[in-house]
Amino acid sequence: KQLFINHTNAMKKILTSLLACCVFAIVCSAQSLPSVSILGDSYSTFEGYVQPDTNALWYFNKVRTQTDVTSVQQTWWHLFVKNQGYRLCVNNSFSGSTICNTGYRNEDYSERSFIARMDHLGNPDVIFIFGATNDAWAGAPIGEYQYENWKKADLYQFRPAMAYMLNYLVNRYPNVELYFLLNSELKESINESVKTICAYYKVDCIQLHDIDKKGGHPSILG
């Protein structure tokens, strides 16, 4: 009887060790996946998945008339992460945010702009920057192309702020893949500016088109 008990205890220890090894392997496998961070606006938000959680959102779990998206699994970035074998590092997206510090109604957006949040993206392997939409919609000052010696006042204009942001990101994340996602149906001055500045910093610019939208934002199909 004592031998049977000892044998049973030994088997339990072996099974426990095997289970622990399996869990450890799963965790390590998940952690070894390349990671993605997002610096974005409303197009990249979703309730419960944005850092910090005080950022304004557009997409929620509940049903809303403004959009048919009700699940994080329907968002562009979640589909990418899941289907391409990545894991999410940080999604620092803020609904209504501009790249520069000038927002809607000429308000000061220096606490929510892309350049205010670009230092809070974790340690990813890939960064997607999905912006310029609100700069276009808000009619932010376009400014001149400027690639150095930025002053505070310069960052309230789109072109200087865009260059300032990419200059920071390529130096802050030298071994990270950077991609700028350019929305469809924006002003040509914004499109031209984004492409020109991305080319200057050798950041890939992905021009989007034919996005199905509802309320000006990507739908499930979009």
Question: Across the structure, where does each feature detected by a protein language model lie?
Answer:
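Short active-site segment of divalent metal-dependent hydrolases/proteases
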Residues: 43-44
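Bacterial N-terminal signal peptides
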Residues: 17-25
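Alpha-helical cap/lid subdomain in secreted, periplasmic
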Residues: 108-221
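Positively charged n-region of N-terminal signal peptides that target proteins for export
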Residues: 11-14
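Short hydrophobic segments within beta-strands
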Residues: 39-40, 181
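Boundary at the C-terminal end of the N-terminal hydrophobic targeting segment
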Residues: 28-30
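Conserved SGNH/GDSL esterase-like catalytic core that processes O-acyl groups on lipids
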Residues: 35-37, 49-147
